[in-house]
Amino acid sequence: MKSFEAHVSIVMPVYNEAACIVPVLSELCRALESAPRHEVVVVDDGSTDGSCELIAGFAASHPCVRALRLDPNAGQSAAFWTGIQAAAGDVIVLMDADGQNDPADIERLVAALDGADICCGYRARRNDTLSKRLASRLANAYRRAVLGDEIIDTGCSLKAFKAALLKPLQYWDGMHRFLPMLASLRGARIVQIPVSHRGRMAGKSKYTNFGRLMRTIRDMRGVAWIQSRTRHFGVVTPQPNSNRDVD
Protein backbone atom coordinates (compact mmCIF):
# COMPACT_ATOMS: atom_id res chain seq x y z
CA MET A 1 0.00 0.00 0.00
CA LYS A 2 2.17 2.83 -1.29
CA SER A 3 2.13 6.00 0.76
CA PHE A 4 -1.34 7.58 0.92
CA GLU A 5 -2.97 5.86 -2.07
CA ALA A 6 -5.62 4.31 0.19
CA HIS A 7 -8.63 6.09 1.67
CA VAL A 8 -7.38 6.72 5.21
CA SER A 9 -9.55 7.30 8.29
CA ILE A 10 -7.90 8.62 11.45
CA VAL A 11 -9.85 7.71 14.59
CA MET A 12 -9.13 9.82 17.68
CA PRO A 13 -10.93 9.46 21.04
CA VAL A 14 -10.99 12.56 23.23
CA TYR A 15 -11.72 13.00 26.93
CA ASN A 16 -11.19 16.37 28.60
CA GLU A 17 -8.44 17.58 26.27
CA ALA A 18 -9.62 21.19 25.85
CA ALA A 19 -6.12 22.47 26.56
CA CYS A 20 -4.58 20.78 23.51
CA ILE A 21 -7.22 19.37 21.14
CA VAL A 22 -7.21 22.28 18.65
CA PRO A 23 -3.41 22.36 18.12
CA VAL A 24 -3.39 18.54 17.94
CA LEU A 25 -6.05 18.55 15.21
CA SER A 26 -4.34 21.41 13.38
CA GLU A 27 -1.04 19.52 13.27
CA LEU A 28 -2.83 16.34 12.14
CA CYS A 29 -4.65 18.06 9.29
CA ARG A 30 -1.39 19.58 8.04
CA ALA A 31 0.25 16.14 8.07
CA LEU A 32 -2.61 14.71 6.00
CA GLU A 33 -2.45 17.31 3.23
CA SER A 34 -0.53 14.86 1.01
CA ALA A 35 -3.27 12.22 1.39
CA PRO A 36 -5.81 12.73 -1.41
CA ARG A 37 -8.53 10.75 0.39
CA HIS A 38 -8.68 11.08 4.13
CA GLU A 39 -10.93 11.86 7.06
CA VAL A 40 -10.48 12.44 10.79
CA VAL A 41 -13.16 10.92 13.02
CA VAL A 42 -12.98 12.57 16.45
CA VAL A 43 -15.03 10.91 19.19
CA ASP A 44 -15.59 12.98 22.31
CA ASP A 45 -16.09 10.59 25.22
CA GLY A 46 -18.45 12.70 27.32
CA SER A 47 -15.94 15.46 28.09
CA THR A 48 -16.89 18.02 30.73
CA ASP A 49 -14.27 20.69 29.97
CA GLY A 50 -15.59 22.07 26.68
CA SER A 51 -13.61 19.72 24.43
CA CYS A 52 -16.74 18.77 22.49
CA GLU A 53 -17.53 22.37 21.57
CA LEU A 54 -13.95 22.99 20.47
CA ILE A 55 -14.02 19.87 18.28
CA ALA A 56 -17.34 20.89 16.73
CA GLY A 57 -15.98 24.36 15.98
CA PHE A 58 -12.85 22.92 14.38
CA ALA A 59 -14.90 20.46 12.30
CA ALA A 60 -17.10 23.29 11.03
CA SER A 61 -14.10 24.87 9.30
CA HIS A 62 -12.36 21.64 8.28
CA PRO A 63 -14.56 19.42 6.05
CA CYS A 64 -12.31 16.38 6.52
CA VAL A 65 -13.05 16.31 10.27
CA ARG A 66 -16.14 14.52 11.62
CA ALA A 67 -17.19 15.11 15.22
CA LEU A 68 -19.03 12.47 17.25
CA ARG A 69 -19.91 12.44 20.96
CA LEU A 70 -20.64 9.71 23.50
CA ASP A 71 -23.06 10.53 26.30
CA PRO A 72 -22.31 9.73 29.04
CA ASN A 73 -18.59 8.97 29.25
CA ALA A 74 -18.15 5.33 28.15
CA GLY A 75 -14.39 4.77 28.12
CA GLN A 76 -11.58 4.68 25.58
CA SER A 77 -12.59 1.34 24.05
CA ALA A 78 -16.13 2.59 23.38
CA ALA A 79 -14.78 5.77 21.82
CA PHE A 80 -12.33 3.89 19.59
CA TRP A 81 -15.00 1.35 18.58
CA THR A 82 -17.52 4.10 17.76
CA GLY A 83 -14.99 5.82 15.53
CA ILE A 84 -13.96 2.56 13.89
CA GLN A 85 -17.55 1.73 12.99
CA ALA A 86 -18.13 5.24 11.64
CA ALA A 87 -14.92 5.30 9.58
CA ALA A 88 -15.34 5.24 5.80
CA GLY A 89 -11.73 4.49 4.87
CA ASP A 90 -10.08 1.31 3.63
CA VAL A 91 -7.36 1.93 6.22
CA ILE A 92 -8.02 3.00 9.80
CA VAL A 93 -5.31 4.67 11.88
CA LEU A 94 -5.77 4.97 15.64
CA MET A 95 -4.09 7.72 17.65
CA ASP A 96 -4.34 9.64 20.91
CA ALA A 97 -5.52 13.23 21.30
CA ASP A 98 -2.87 14.55 23.69
CA GLY A 99 -0.12 15.29 21.17
CA GLN A 100 2.17 12.45 22.22
CA ASN A 101 1.74 10.71 18.84
CA ASP A 102 3.47 12.43 15.92
CA PRO A 103 1.16 12.55 12.86
CA ALA A 104 4.24 12.60 10.63
CA ASP A 105 4.53 8.86 11.36
CA ILE A 106 1.13 8.05 9.85
CA GLU A 107 2.35 7.84 6.25
CA ARG A 108 4.96 5.21 7.19
CA LEU A 109 2.36 3.18 9.08
CA VAL A 110 0.02 3.16 6.09
CA ALA A 111 2.84 2.31 3.66
CA ALA A 112 3.79 -0.69 5.82
CA LEU A 113 0.38 -2.25 5.11
CA ASP A 114 1.64 -3.16 1.64
CA GLY A 115 2.74 -6.50 3.11
CA ALA A 116 0.60 -6.73 6.22
CA ASP A 117 -2.87 -6.18 7.66
CA ILE A 118 -1.78 -4.27 10.77
CA CYS A 119 1.15 -1.98 11.47
CA CYS A 120 1.82 -1.29 15.16
CA GLY A 121 3.97 1.63 16.18
CA TYR A 122 6.32 1.24 19.11
CA ARG A 123 7.88 4.13 21.01
CA ALA A 124 11.61 3.76 20.36
CA ARG A 125 12.51 6.60 22.73
CA ARG A 126 9.81 7.10 25.33
CA ASN A 127 9.28 10.58 26.69
CA ASP A 128 7.78 9.32 29.96
CA THR A 129 8.57 9.19 33.65
CA LEU A 130 10.58 6.28 35.00
CA SER A 131 7.51 4.89 36.80
CA LYS A 132 5.50 4.83 33.56
CA ARG A 133 8.30 3.12 31.67
CA LEU A 134 8.68 0.47 34.38
CA ALA A 135 4.92 -0.17 34.55
CA SER A 136 4.77 -0.50 30.76
CA ARG A 137 7.74 -2.87 30.70
CA LEU A 138 6.12 -5.05 33.37
CA ALA A 139 2.77 -5.13 31.56
CA ASN A 140 4.36 -6.00 28.21
CA ALA A 141 6.45 -8.79 29.76
CA TYR A 142 3.42 -10.27 31.50
CA ARG A 143 1.41 -10.03 28.32
CA ARG A 144 4.02 -11.87 26.28
CA ALA A 145 4.17 -14.61 28.92
CA VAL A 146 0.38 -15.05 29.03
CA LEU A 147 -0.60 -14.50 25.40
CA GLY A 148 2.61 -15.38 23.60
CA ASP A 149 2.28 -12.46 21.20
CA GLU A 150 5.22 -10.39 20.01
CA ILE A 151 3.78 -6.89 20.22
CA ILE A 152 6.64 -4.70 21.41
CA ASP A 153 4.66 -1.78 22.83
CA THR A 154 0.98 -2.44 23.49
CA GLY A 155 0.55 0.96 25.14
CA CYS A 156 1.32 2.85 21.93
CA SER A 157 -2.01 3.85 20.41
CA LEU A 158 -0.55 4.74 17.01
CA LYS A 159 -1.52 1.80 14.81
CA ALA A 160 -2.80 1.27 11.27
CA PHE A 161 -5.28 -1.44 10.29
CA LYS A 162 -6.95 -2.62 7.13
CA ALA A 163 -10.57 -1.76 7.88
CA ALA A 164 -11.95 -5.10 6.69
CA LEU A 165 -10.17 -6.88 9.56
CA LEU A 166 -10.83 -4.28 12.24
CA LYS A 167 -14.52 -3.49 11.83
CA PRO A 168 -15.88 -7.02 12.51
CA LEU A 169 -14.27 -7.24 15.96
CA GLN A 170 -16.85 -7.37 18.73
CA TYR A 171 -16.87 -4.51 21.24
CA TRP A 172 -16.08 -5.00 24.91
CA ASP A 173 -14.68 -2.58 27.48
CA GLY A 174 -10.88 -2.75 27.41
CA MET A 175 -10.60 -4.21 23.91
CA HIS A 176 -8.54 -1.30 22.53
CA ARG A 177 -5.44 -2.66 24.30
CA PHE A 178 -5.73 -5.98 22.47
CA LEU A 179 -6.86 -5.08 18.95
CA PRO A 180 -3.79 -6.54 17.16
CA MET A 181 -4.06 -9.80 19.12
CA LEU A 182 -7.81 -10.08 18.49
CA ALA A 183 -7.32 -9.43 14.77
CA SER A 184 -4.45 -11.94 14.61
CA LEU A 185 -6.85 -14.63 15.80
CA ARG A 186 -8.66 -13.99 12.50
CA GLY A 187 -5.44 -14.43 10.54
CA ALA A 188 -4.18 -10.83 10.43
CA ARG A 189 -0.52 -10.31 9.54
CA ILE A 190 1.25 -7.82 11.82
CA VAL A 191 4.36 -5.68 11.32
CA GLN A 192 5.87 -3.15 13.72
CA ILE A 193 7.84 0.05 13.17
CA PRO A 194 9.42 2.60 15.53
CA VAL A 195 7.53 5.87 15.97
CA SER A 196 8.21 9.14 17.73
CA HIS A 197 6.99 9.78 21.25
CA ARG A 198 6.55 13.26 22.66
CA GLY A 199 5.40 14.80 25.89
CA ARG A 200 1.83 15.98 26.22
CA MET A 201 1.06 19.30 24.57
CA ALA A 202 -0.98 20.25 27.65
CA GLY A 203 -3.24 18.77 30.31
CA LYS A 204 -2.65 15.61 32.30
CA SER A 205 -3.14 11.86 31.91
CA LYS A 206 -6.49 10.37 32.90
CA TYR A 207 -4.85 7.12 34.07
CA THR A 208 -2.75 6.04 37.01
CA ASN A 209 0.07 3.56 36.38
CA PHE A 210 -1.26 1.03 38.90
CA GLY A 211 -4.88 1.32 37.78
CA ARG A 212 -4.00 0.81 34.13
CA LEU A 213 -1.78 -2.17 34.98
CA MET A 214 -4.47 -3.90 37.05
CA ARG A 215 -7.11 -3.45 34.35
CA THR A 216 -4.75 -4.75 31.68
CA ILE A 217 -3.94 -7.86 33.70
CA ARG A 218 -7.62 -8.52 34.34
CA ASP A 219 -8.59 -8.09 30.69
CA MET A 220 -5.66 -10.22 29.59
CA ARG A 221 -7.19 -13.24 31.27
CA GLY A 222 -10.28 -12.82 29.11
CA VAL A 223 -8.21 -12.51 25.94
CA ALA A 224 -6.25 -15.62 26.91
CA TRP A 225 -9.56 -17.48 27.23
CA ILE A 226 -10.65 -16.32 23.75
CA GLN A 227 -7.26 -17.32 22.38
CA SER A 228 -7.49 -20.80 23.90
CA ARG A 229 -10.92 -21.36 22.31
CA THR A 230 -9.95 -20.19 18.82
CA ARG A 231 -9.52 -22.84 16.12
CA HIS A 232 -8.35 -22.15 12.58
CA PHE A 233 -9.85 -24.21 9.78
CA GLY A 234 -10.75 -24.04 6.12
CA VAL A 235 -13.87 -25.07 4.22
CA VAL A 236 -13.73 -26.94 0.92
CA THR A 237 -16.40 -28.29 -1.40
CA PRO A 238 -16.03 -32.07 -1.80
CA GLN A 239 -15.71 -33.29 -5.38
CA PRO A 240 -16.91 -36.66 -6.73
CA ASN A 241 -14.25 -39.25 -7.49
CA SER A 242 -13.78 -39.05 -11.27
CA ASN A 243 -12.28 -42.57 -11.37
CA ARG A 244 -15.49 -44.24 -10.23
CA ASP A 245 -18.29 -45.17 -12.60
CA VAL A 246 -21.57 -43.40 -11.93
CA ASP A 247 -24.75 -45.39 -12.67
Please name every model-derived segment.
Residues 116-167, 218-222:
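Short, flexible, basic/aromatic active-site loop/helix in glycosyltransferases
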